[in-house]
Amino acid sequence: MKRIGLTGVAAVAVLGMALAGCTSGGPLATLPAANGASASASGTGAAASASAKPTPAGPAVTITPGNGSRGADPSKGITVTASGGTLKNVSVHTAGDPVTGTYSAGNASWHSTWALDVSQSYTVTVTAAASNGSTVTKTAAFRTLTPASTFTTEILEGSGQSYGVGMPIILYFSQRITNRAAVERALQVSTSKPVIGSWYWDYPCNMAATCAYFRPRDYWPAGTTVSFTGHLNGVEGAPGVYGHHTLTQTFGIGQSVIAVASTQAHRTKIYINGKLAYNWPISSGKPGDDTPDGSYLTIEKENPVRMVGPGYDLLVPWSVRFTFSGDYYHDAYWSTGEQGFENVSHGCVNLAPADAETYYNLAVPGDPITIGGSPRGGAWDNGWTMWFLPWSQYLKGSALHEAVEAGPGGSTFVDPATLPRDTAKAPLQTAAANNSV
C-alpha cells in the first residue's frame, strides 16, 4: 500500500464557450470628437453642444470565496456567477493542485470540480460579457483554512502491479469517516475497458479506522488498466476533519484465473480466461477444522511458508493464502493418498506437489477462490471478502446509494435502476455451492 501526494504549481485557465449571438445588440455608441464648434463670423452658433452617452455597464460578476477571504472552507470549492451576462473565461492560479471546473448551461455560472487544498492561496480571474458586447474582468484572492485535524488515505494496490480479476480497490482511512457521501464523490476510477461497479464502506475494518472498497459488478475484464484518483485534499470527512492530500495509483488486471473447490467432491477446478484448464484432487479441512465456504480472493503467496499448529511445525512449499486467519492452497506431499477421497487437513486446501506449484506460478493477489460444500461458513473480513455479497446487497454499502460507470474518460455515479441488466454468467460460483466440481 502506498500514500501518494501530488503537489506543484498549477495555473489552470478554464475557457468558456462564447454564446452565439452575444453581439446581436446594437453597436456601441461613439463619443463625438468635440463637445462644441467655433461660432460663425456673424456670431450665430452652427453646432450645439453634444452630450456624451454613458458606457454600457458590464455584467455583475460574483466570486465566492470573496476577495481577501481568510479561512475559506475548501470543501465548498469556488463558485463564479455572472448576472446580466455570460462567463467568457475563468482562470485559477495556485501553488497547489490544479483547479478544474464546469460551466452551467448558458455559461451563467462556473463551479470548481473538486474541493480545494487546505492551507492554500488562490487567485481567481474572471472575464464576463454582456449581450451588447461590453465586458468586465474581476479578480479575487483568498486563502483556505488550516484544519485542526486531518485524515490520511492509503491505497493497497502498488503502482504498475498486476492483480487478479476479483481485486477490489482497497482504501484505508486514518480516521473514522462519517461524511462518507462527500468522500465517495471525490473518488474517481478510470478504466481502459468499460466497467460497472460500486463503492462499499466498511467500519471498523482490518488495518484502519475506516475502509472503502471499489468492486465491479462482475469480475474485471482481463487485461484492464485501472487508474484511481482520490481528490481528497480539502474534503471534510468528519466534522472539522479534512483530507490534506490527493491520492493516485495505476495498476493492471492480468489474466482471469479462477479456482472453484468442492470440499465434498474433493476436487478443485482451475479456469483460465473462462476455460477449464485443470481439475485436481484435493483434501480440505477435516471435521472440526473444516475449510470455510465463501468467495475469497488470493492475498499473497510464499514458498515456503512456516505453518505451526497442534502437533506440527512445517515449512510448506507452494503456498497461496486466501484468508487472514491462515487458510491456503498449498503443497501437501504428506496427504497425496487422501487427496480426491478424504478431508484430512487442518483447514487448508491440500494439493499434490506438481499441482500446487502450477497454481502458485499462476496466482496473483486478487484471483478468485470459491469454496463450497463445507458445513462451516466463512466470515466477513477474514480475507478480502467483498465477493461474499451479491451485487444487490453490495450496492447498499455505497454512501450515495449509486453505482459507478467507469471507462477511459473517468467515472460517473448512476442510479443502479438505469443500468443495463446483468447478463454475466455465474456457473463458476454456483458449481462449488452445488458440489458439482
Model-identified regions with their sequence ranges:
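Structural recognition of the beta-strand scaffold that forms the well-ordered cores
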Residues: 170-171, 259-262, 268-270, 278-279, ...
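A general beta-strand register signal
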Residues: 93, 190, 271, 321-323
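Exported/periplasmic cell-wall-interacting domains
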Residues: 165, 290-293, 302-305, 309-437
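A structural motif detector for short, solvent-exposed N-terminal "entry" segments of globular domains
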Residues: 247-286
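Solvent-exposed, polar/charged alpha-helical surfaces in well-ordered, non-transmembrane soluble domains
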Residues: 171, 175, 218, 266, ...
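Short, surface-exposed linear segments at secondary-structure transitions and domain or protein termini
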Residues: 148, 209, 286-295, 341
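Residue-level structural signal for beta-strand termini and adjacent loop
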Residues: 105, 141, 282-283, 334
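Acidic, low-complexity Ser/Thr/Gly/Pro-rich repeat segments typical of extracellular/periplasmic
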Residues: 2-255, 405-406, 418, 430
